[in-house]
Every structure is written in C-alpha cells, then in structure tokens.
Amino acid sequence: MEEKEKLLGRMMRLCAGRECCRSDIRRKLAALPPAAAQEVLDTLCREGYLDDARYARAFARDKSALQGWGSLKIQLALQRKQIDATDIAAALEAIDLPAADAKMEQVLRAKWKSLAREEDPARKEAKFFRYALGRGYGYQEIKRIYDYLGRD
C-alpha cells in the first residue's frame, strides 16, 4: 500500500510538471499490480493531473510549432500513445495552420538547400519527397513547396 502512495505522489509531481497521457503513466506504473495501477490512474484523472484530450492538444501544438511535424506524423504518434480518435481529431483541428505552414516551408527550404550539391534531379526530388513524407506532410503540400522551390 505504501508503494502505491509513493508512486501516486511521484506521478502527481510528474504530471504537474508536464503533460502526460494515460499510456505514459501506465508504462511507469508497470511494477504495480494492475488493480493498483488503475486506481492510481483513476485518481490522477479525477484530480485533473491527467487528461488525454489536453495532452493531445499540447502534443500536437508543440510538435507542429517547435519540431515542424506534419499532421500525419502527429496523428500516428498520438495513435501509438493510445489516444482516443476524437481527441486526436480535436488536437489536429487546434493546430495553428498558418504557423504550421510557415514552419513546414522553413523545414523543407532547409532540406532543399542541403540538397543543392545533388546533381541528379531525380535523386534530388526523391530525397526531398522521402524526407518530407517522413516528417508527416501530405503529398499535395510537399508538391506545392517542391514546385515553388524548384523554380528558384
């Protein structure tokens, strides 16, 4: 019983310091019996320390604005964390699209510059598209930026 209380305190401090989702905390509580771990999770949710919808919004906002991830990569990462589909959709809707587009252009422009020494245009295009798809951008978005950068 004492171990459960100690872990609850640790998880409260962790959740107070940064956003966490249920799957993150569940993984950290693996040492506890399943019933005790569920009780800790329920307490964290009830007291407002843990909210998957809030986590999804913060995750999507940060990955888009700070790391330049596209919506497809964000969606996949949230699915891996077992976030509900409605929370994922709401988080993706909350992304600041003009800022995300500007960040995407900045990231892809930097990649384009790094490919300047590539002499074969087909290889240059393949590397550019592979990189951009890996960042989670959609094909139409990538094509628009590629056409724009290819004219420079």
Model-found features: residue ranges?
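An alpha-helical, amphipathic repeat domain used for nucleic-acid recognition
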Residues: 1-152
